[in-house]
Amino acid sequence: MAKTVDVVLLRERRKRKRRLFRFLIILAVVLFGALLYTSREKWFPKLEKIGSQHANLNAETEGEFMLTVSGGVDYHAEFVNNNLFVLCDKYIYIYDMNGELQDSRQHAYSNAIMKTNQDKALLYSHNGTSFRVDNSKKMLFEENLDDSIWFGVLSDDGRVAIITGSETYACCLYIYDATGKLIYTRNCLERLIDVSFQNQGCICATIGSENGEVVTVLKYIQFQESDVQWTSEALPALCWHVYSMKDGGAFVIGDTKTAYYNNTGDLINSYAYNGSLIDCDFFNNQGAVLLKNESRRQSILLLFSDSSTNPVTVYFDSICKNVKIQDNIIYLLDAGKIRSYSFTGTELSCFEINDAYEKILKNGKYFYLLGYDRIQRMSGG
């Protein structure tokens, strides 16, 4: 007798097999996608950086190379322990001196700001509520605050000052040690605009107004004391930076003048200038201020090395962009040139570069030229 086949049952079985097969395919795709997502911090930076480095190591340009920065706009670069830290929109990339990528770390800071010393980098975002400190090997610590961050400062020994807004006071100052432990807090009645560490305390630059003009007042506090140790007289200028001197005094670079103070807050000397402040730097009790006179298409370099005398002045018939101090030498990014000077105003070197760069870094015998979306290394002339 012929075998009877249930056609309807057979069709149902085939449909179930097809549905099961489709389900397994979809499940595999979902699992693979989940695996990619959970491991994105490992593979995405590598994809993001494909084609980002162009090496140029021929005989004519020995030691030179070019890094292309993903995203370009608003990146920030500094050297930390001979490693180039490049802060971008979502990641911080760490390169060795030869342009080889050593590490890439994700951060969650919008419009991130980076402050560095010789060994570490402080990362935060203006109006954010968290900050972190990294070194070349790893992120060391991250802290969260209740109020929005105005700015942060990283000391040479790794201490961190964070200034936040406040609903009750003008602002709040938080001091952390090098391990991330909170060691000091202060509710401030005046608005802080800059902070410079000085021994076991810090010099705070506050801004206010007198007779309708902006003034800067310095206050020195010690972390073991609640009272302010000294307060300076008002300086009729908007402070850009305050720097601690080795003798316990301070040097202020303002928008219209500079000022020296002794270790009790008394004004020693000040110097007023006409011109717009472009850039400044300070190291080892010596300062450099770069000004521009737009109407004359002229730049002015002021060199400060002695609190008792006026600065050495150097003039340029072009608009310069950036000034750096390293090993007691001033490096100036001119229009299509890098110049170097001693603090006596003597020009030590000058060589031409592409004019498409906005900032210079120097590490060892190399210059690192920062442009819109690229970083070029070149030897110093």
Feature annotation, model-predicted:
Residues 1-20:
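N-terminal Lys/Arg-rich, disordered targeting/topogenic segments
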Residues 102-201, 205-206, 212:
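Non-cytosolic head/periplasmic domains of membrane-anchored proteins
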Residues 70-78, 108-119, 147-156, 188-199, ...:
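Repeated scaffold domains used in trafficking and secretory/extracellular systems
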Residues 61-93, 105-114:
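Beta-strand-rich domains and repeat architectures in extracellular enzymes and scaffolds
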Residues 21-38:
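Hydrophobic membrane-insertion alpha-helices, especially the h-region
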Residues 169-259:
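Solenoidal tandem-repeat scaffolds enriched in leucines and small polar residues
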Residues 55-69, 98-106, 137-144, 180-187, ...:
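A short beta-strand motif characteristic of beta-propeller blades
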Residues 39-41, 91-93, 129-133, 168-174, ...:
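Structural motif
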